[in-house]
UniProtKB/Swiss-Prot annotation:
Name under which the protein is recorded: Serine/threonine-protein phosphatase PP2A-3 catalytic subunit
Coiled-coil annotated spans: none
GO MF entries: metal ion binding; protein serine/threonine phosphatase activity
Predominant location: cytoplasm
Originating organism: Oryza sativa subsp. japonica
Family the entry assigns: Belongs to the PPP phosphatase family. PP-2A subfamily.
Sites where the protein binds Mn(2+) 1: D55, H57, D83
Cofactor names: Mn(2+)
Record field: catalytic activity: O-phospho-L-seryl-[protein] + H2O = L-seryl-[protein] + phosphate; O-phospho-L-threonyl-[protein] + H2O = L-threonyl-[protein] + phosphate
Pfam families: Metallophos
Length: 307
């Protein structure tokens, strides 16, 4: 039975205190979210004003700081470009809060899929282990990773700003090509869906082999052609650590937004979010990490951040 607004409001309040939900509550929440996400598109339309956010990676207290800086949901409309889990200490609470907000305010928050919203990657970079540690079994990991298959791959703000986690694909020239993909599956090792979540812009022209081992690098010529073909003014993406929190590249055809400050609790970077206003005006808000909380007892070393 779907949770009432009152139930959801209670769960959101609990999660905002960094207290995870009961296993059964997570199961019900994921089922509700799945029903909502099934109705969304591979290229999900979004209206302005909206605030665009990059990687969060389980840095729960920095997500709370993001909402403090950018405005609370649902007063501010949000678009998150993936990578909610892994590496940080609070992936469970982070993804639970974002999914609960999606279920409560479905038209006010858009959550896209990142390369870490995958069964395989989360078994290596922390989310699986965190679920085991906090729940004593892998059920919650399974509920969330099953849900991840339904997340939209990209979003389109007012037919002008194209948002996605990673980057472009040599197999995809148009937004209609993306609309035709079957997204409801685990992230493949290769191919167009993989590329959208894994690719990066590069200083060299054309397509290149990605050092990540998945996706491609793409040059300014590729981004310009894609934007021209599809009537776009900008590609907004996440996926790469940038020290100022945002970084323009490729003659302002592409911007990277990264929203995890002091990434992996050691990189020393600022975070940023991108406000897109009523008239499509753009404003970046930068922020530093929230004050450090007492870290949970975890003996695993923080994995390297290059993925």
């Amino acid at each position: 039975m779907p949770s009432s607004h009152g139930d959801l409001d209670r769960q959101i309040a609990q999660l905002r205190e960094c207290k995870h939900l009961a296993e059964g509550e997570v199961r019900a929440l994921c089922e509700q979210a799945k029903a909502i996400l099934m109705e969304e598109w591979n290229v999900q339309p979004v209206r302005c004003p909206v605030t665009v956010c990059g990687d969060i990676h389980g840095q729960f207290y920095d997500l709370i700081e993001l909402f403090r800086i950018g405005g609370e949901a649902p007063d501010t409309n949000y678009l998150f470009m993936g990578d909610y889990v892994d590496r940080g200490y609070y992936s469970v609470e982070t993804v639970s809060l974002l999914v609960a907000l999606k279920v409560r305010y479905r038209d006010r928050i858009t959550i896209l899929r990142g390369n870490h919203e995958s069964r395989q990657i989360t078994q290596v970079y922390g989310f699986y282990d965190e679920c085991l540690r906090k729940y004593g079994n892998a059920n919650v990991w399974k509920y969330f990773t099953d849900l991840f298959d339904y997340l939209p791959l990209t979003a389109l703000i007012e037919n002008q700003v194209f948002c996605l986690h990673g980057g472009l694909s040599p197999s995809l020239d148009t937004l209609d090509n993306i609309r035709a993909l079957d997204r409801i599956q685990e992230v493949p090792h290769e191919g167009p869906m993989c590329d959208l979540l894994w690719s990066d812009p590069d200083d060299r022209c054309g397509w290149g082999i990605s050092p990540r081992g998945a996706g491609y690098t793409f040059g300014q010529d590729i981004a310009q052609q894609f934007n021209h073909t599809n009537g776009l003014s900008l590609i907004s993406r996440a996926h790469q650590l940038v020290m100022e929190g945002f970084n323009w590249c490729q003659d302002k055809n592409v911007v990277t937004v990264f929203s995890a400050p002091n990434y992996c609790y050691r990189c020393g970077n600022m975070a940023a979010i991108l406000e897109i206003g009523e008239n499509m005006d753009q404003n970046f808000l930068q922020f530093d990490p929230a004050p450090r909380q007492i870290e949970p007892d975890t003996t695993r070393k923080t994995p390297d951040y290059f993925l």
